[in-house]
A protein has these predicted regions:
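Small-residue-biased structural context
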Residues: 1-180
Length: 180
């Protein structure tokens, strides 16, 4: 039987969970694009307020956890495991990834203020430039991780390391593991 909804992978597949987060980020970025065309025509109507609320919720709650998953668990595990070409690539990519996380957080603070006003119905203004910059940063960042970091993790991390990564991600979200 097929389901009507996409289900998220379990924490026993931590790299798949991170990819699922990227897919959700892409959906939120698409919502921001839709808001850019919706607001000039309809203003901060109920649809716009709900869309702003959804984007706010994702980028203030889920996205920071995703960054912590990478910074506190995934990237350190890769650093301790990688050798030769993988170690050289990580040495090159890690500073860039960390810098991108900081830049995305800073750019988010600009958008967050605008989206809160839309959510409250007090403004229908959303900066196209801010949206484009934020989206471009995230899309580039996710491509980098999906092209280099995720395949490396799948290739070099042991089952035990994957299990620890998944358990840390689950705990970070306050999800109690199944007793089974």
């Amino acid at each position: 039987m097929t389901t009507l909804f996409d289900s998220a992978p379990g924490f026993d597949q931590p790299i798949a969970v991170l990819k699922h987060c990227h897919d959700r980020i892409r959906k939120q970025l698409a919502t921001l694009d839709k808001l850019l065309t919706h607001l000039p025509v309809h203003g901060a109507d109920q649809d716009a307020r709900q869309a702003a609320q959804a984007v706010l919720k994702y980028f203030t709650q889920a996205a920071p956890l995703h960054h912590e998953d990478e910074e506190m668990d995934l990237l350190p595990a890769l650093e301790t495991t990688a050798t030769q070409e993988d170690a050289a690539l990580l040495k090159q990519l890690l500073p860039e990834i960390m810098k991108q996380h900081l830049q995305m957080t800073a750019q988010w603070s600009n958008l967050e203020k605008q989206l809160k006003q839309i959510q409250e119905g007090s403004s229908a203004q959303l900066s196209t430039l801010d949206i484009r910059h934020f989206s471009d940063m995230y899309l580039h960042h996710m491509e980098l991780e999906e092209t280099h970091i995720a395949p490396m993790a799948k290739r070099i991390l042991s089952d035990a390391q994957m299990q620890r990564l998944g358990a840390a991600m689950q705990a970070r979200r306050g999800i109690v593991p199944d007793a089974s």
